[in-house]
């Protein structure tokens, strides 16, 4: 089962969503309070399972309404996804993937793991 690992960093507090194997599948922005971070986790739990995928790498792609996963190519030419909440705010983002199929698998992993993932504190 996946978990949301909450971690304090120099500039605030953030979370990583980890799959059952411990691999980070999505990360948050840095929040200035634990309460805000926990709200972000709840937003991912609520939005990930219902969010459609907007593949911005496809020619003439269909624009989806928020909440949604956006698939895009970064400056390094790698595929990434970000999960946007209903208000359009980015609530989770991925690392870069060399293959689009791997990126899409990452989205499926977030959809599967987020709803029931436990929250744990990390050093």
Give residue spans per PLM region.
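A structural feature that tracks compact, well-ordered secondary-structure segments
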Residues: 3-31, 40-44, 68-98, 102-110
